[in-house]
A protein has these predicted regions:
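Active-site and ligand/interface coordination hotspots across diverse enzymes
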Residues: 1-44
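Short amphipathic alpha-helices and their capping/turn segments at secondary-structure boundaries
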Residues: 2, 9-21, 48-59, 117-134
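Divalent-metal-activated hydrolytic enzyme cores
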Residues: 3-5, 21, 90-118, 124-128, ...
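A structural signal for short, well-ordered beta-strand segments and their strand-loop junctions
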Residues: 27, 63-67, 132-139, 205-210
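Short catalytic/ligand-binding loop motif for oxyanion handling, primarily in non-cytosolic enzymes
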Residues: 35-36, 73-75, 142-148, 152, ...
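Short, surface-exposed acidic-centric catalytic microdomains
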Residues: 46-100
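Internal, conserved structured core segments that host functional sites
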Residues: 98, 102, 106-109, 116, ...
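Short Gly/Thr/Asp-enriched flexible loops that form oxyanion-binding sites at enzyme active sites
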Residues: 141-164, 185-189, 193
Length: 239
């Protein structure tokens, strides 16, 4: 059996100088720190979800903001690539929605695989540096960042495709197109993270921010209930 590799000079220096860092970090979904990247209609705060961030700060964790995978895969902050089939029922693109959705998901998975590889490199870097990655916080009902609940993208698409432009309100978007189309399972980005962590032999406890509670104005805690599952490619919820 091979022994553990010797600590690097940088790690030895950190141990020698003993500064005030807590050596614990939590990976946090991008929109918990910046709701400007939320889907249209889904932002409930001008910026960060203060109680979520405050809980982590009070517990002494460093906060590592994950990339917003949807911004990077779907055309930018407003995610224009995801909007082509909105209000499309009765129009030219609507009969092609199944084919277009399959192509959209294939593209999304390709981008998410690349992003997940970088996140896993970050996790490995923290661990080599003697810093514990104590958890990852996803977003419930997200098609990308859901840990145990995600979005039925096809069902959500049917809601927004059938809704006339003038009738699409925040309530329709949040209650029908998002919360009304939730299902058990993990989002596409979390699934990519699962696979990449398994390949590197790494594990990260996973927590989930309750988007429904946030949208409906309820307070919640991220860490008190304990991790919902461990991201490592094993025991992945079924699609």
């Amino acid at each position: 059996m091979r022994g553990r590799s010797a600590p690097s000079p940088a790690r030895l220096l950190l141990d020698q100088l003993r500064d005030e860092r807590g050596r614990r970090v939590v990976l946090v979904s991008h929109c918990l720190l910046n709701e400007n990247t939320r889907y249209a209609g889904g932002a409930t705060r001008p910026g960060a979800v203060a109680e979520a961030v405050g809980e982590l700060i009070a517990a002494g964790y460093g906060i590592h903001q994950l990339p917003c995978p949807e911004r990077l895969a779907w055309g930018g902050v407003l995610k224009p690539h995801s909007l082509h089939l909105y209000h499309s029922k009765g129009r030219l693109l609507y009969p092609l929605r199944g084919l277009l959705l399959r192509a959209f998901v294939v593209w999304t998975r390709m981008v998410y695989r690349r992003l997940a590889r970088q996140v896993v490199r970050d996790v490995a870097d923290y661990q080599r540096s003697g810093i514990t990655v104590a958890g990852m916080v996803g977003i419930g009902a997200s098609p990308s960042c859901g840990v145990t609940t995600t979005l039925d993208i096809r069902a959500s698409l049917e809601v927004v495709a059938a809704c006339p432009t003038a009738a699409l309100t925040r309530d329709v978007m949040n209650e029908r197109a998002v919360l009304g189309c939730r299902r058990k399972g993990e989002g596409l980005f979390i699934a990519a993270l699962d696979r990449q962590l398994r390949r590197r032999g790494l594990q990260v406890p996973a927590f989930e921010h309750d988007l429904a509670a946030e949208l409906r104005g309820s307070q919640q805690t991220l860490l008190t209930p304990g991790a919902l599952r461990t991201l490592d490619g094993l025991g992945t919820p079924g699609d």
